[in-house]
UniProtKB/Swiss-Prot annotation:
Organism encoding this protein: Rhodopseudomonas palustris (strain BisA53)
Pfam families: OSCP
Cellular component terms per the entry's GO annotation: plasma membrane; proton-transporting ATP synthase complex
Taxonomic lineage: Bacteria, Pseudomonadati, Pseudomonadota, Alphaproteobacteria, Hyphomicrobiales
Entry keyword Transport: yes
Name of protein: ATP synthase subunit delta
Topology in membrane: Peripheral membrane protein
Subunit structure comment from the entry: F-type ATPases have 2 components, F(1) - the catalytic core - and F(0) - the membrane proton channel. F(1) has five subunits: alpha(3), beta(3), gamma(1), delta(1), epsilon(1). CF(0) has four main subunits: a(1), b(1), b'(1) and c(10-14). The alpha and beta chains form an alternating ring which encloses part of the gamma chain. F(1) is attached to F(0) by a central stalk formed by the gamma and epsilon chains, while a peripheral stalk is formed by the delta, b and b' chains.
Length: 186
């Protein structure tokens, strides 16, 4: 299955595929996804947790003890907790972000959904997010989950990546196009 979807390749893809197949067999795909999303949010909020996960300086034992405490505090248990502990035992915890992303792609494919990566200069409000989801749904015919990244460097507009397609309507790109046109004309 990992070979069918380019977004789930490599080590992260193999781990995500194994986790997905187990979760599907146990009929707990949604619960595992919710737990992994909670862990991903914790990583985004805590630089210390991110450092613990990514740094090879910590021993597997130290990471394991800290991970058990973090998972217990977050209420993450069952398959997701066992899986995260397996990643730690195999010294692959540094790849957890990519594994979670690949798992999400597998879940979306399983449910007939699409995932779009959207880059914006400023956070979008709920009304704009809903409008973007509706527009993408009308194009794809599928429910669309948005992964929104804020990057002030694009100045304005947005960049949408959906599968192998990308639409770049950022102000930065438009300004670069004008700059190149002026160089060629000048």
């Amino acid at each position: 299955m990992a070979a069918e979807n380019p977004s789930v390749s490599g080590v992260a893809g193999r781990y995500a595929t194994a986790l997905f197949e187990l979760a599907r067999d146990q009929k707990s795909v949604d619960a595992v996804k919710a737990d992994l999303d909670r862990f991903k949010a914790m990583l985004a909020e805590s630089p210390d947790l991110t450092r613990l996960v990514r740094s090879p300086v910590f021993s597997a034992d130290a990471q394991g003890k800290a991970l058990v405490a973090v998972l217990a505090k977050a209420g993450i248990g069952g398959i997701a907790a066992n899986f995260l502990q397996l990643l730690n035992a195999n010294r692959r915890l540094f790849a957890v972000h990519d594994v979670i992303r690949a798992f999400g792609a597998l879940v979306a494919k399983f449910k007939g959904e699409a995932t779009a990566d959207v880059t914006v200069a400023e956070p979008l409000n709920d009304q704009n997010l809903d409008a973007l989801k509706s527009a993408l749904k009308s194009v794809t015919g599928k429910d669309v989950t948005l992964n929104v990244n804020v990057d002030p460097a694009i100045i304005g507009g947005l960049v949408v990546k959906l599968g192998s397609r990308m639409v770049d309507s950022s102000l930065r790109t438009k300004l670069n196009s004008i700059k190149h046109a002026m160089k060629e004309a000048g």
